[in-house]
């Protein structure tokens, strides 16, 4: 009986360890954005609005050149936003936005599962290719492989089979947005 229990326990642990983690570890992701320092940012509004998403990129290192967090909405009527990072805390951080800081992250709020962050680079193209907004604001498309992804799930909804979007942990505590893996 004791051996049977040990075998069952080992199998449960084996299956638990093999469960697929939805969080991508392909590229490092670390992003932090505070509403205290940027209270009017569309990023703060977006993270609280189900079905809304933005693309976030960063430029500058915060030491030799000023750091900027650039935000582009999935709503074409909303102007792009350039947030200059001035606080010492934010400038000390090393922002890593997945596959490429120039391509960035897609951050938003799903309709059913709260805050979400995805890599904005197509996971199915061997060359880093930025995803583009479609006419439907909750979808992105790769102009190279023509796959369309649904941002609520990260899954392909049109085009050849392949990998889902690279997803990162994302939280908003009412003050700070964090994306990481």
Features from the language model and the residues they span:
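Short Fe-S-cluster ligation motifs
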Residues: 147-181
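Short solvent-exposed loop/turn micro-motifs enriched in small/polar/acidic residues
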Residues: 100, 142, 161-165
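N-terminal pre-ligand scaffold of iron-sulfur
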Residues: 21-134, 168-181
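Acidic, glycine-rich flexible loop segments
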Residues: 116-159
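C-terminal motif of bacterial Sec signal peptides marking the signal peptidase cleavage site
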Residues: 13-16
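Sec-dependent signal peptide recognition
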Residues: 2-8
């Amino acid at each position: 009986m004791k051996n049977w229990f040990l075998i069952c326990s080992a199998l449960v642990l084996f299956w638990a360890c093999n469960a697929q983690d939805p969080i991508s570890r392909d590229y490092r992701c670390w992003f932090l954005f505070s509403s205290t320092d940027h209270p009017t940012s569309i990023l703060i509004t977006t993270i609280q609005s189900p079905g809304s998403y933005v693309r976030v990129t960063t430029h500058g290192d915060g030491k030799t050149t000023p750091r900027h967090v650039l935000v582009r909405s999935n709503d074409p009527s909303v102007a792009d936003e350039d947030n200059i990072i001035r606080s010492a805390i934010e400038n000390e951080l090393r922002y890593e936005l997945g596959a490429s800081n120039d391509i960035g992250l897609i951050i938003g709020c799903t309709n059913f599962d709260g805050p979400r962050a995805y890599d904005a680079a197509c996971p199915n193209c061997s060359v880093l290719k930025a995803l583009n907004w479609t006419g439907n604001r909750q979808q992105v498309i790769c102009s190279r492989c023509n796959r369309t992804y649904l941002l609520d799930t990260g899954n392909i909804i049109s085009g050849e089979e392949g990998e889902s979007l690279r997803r990162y942990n994302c939280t908003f505590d009412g003050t700070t947005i964090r994306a990481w893996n």
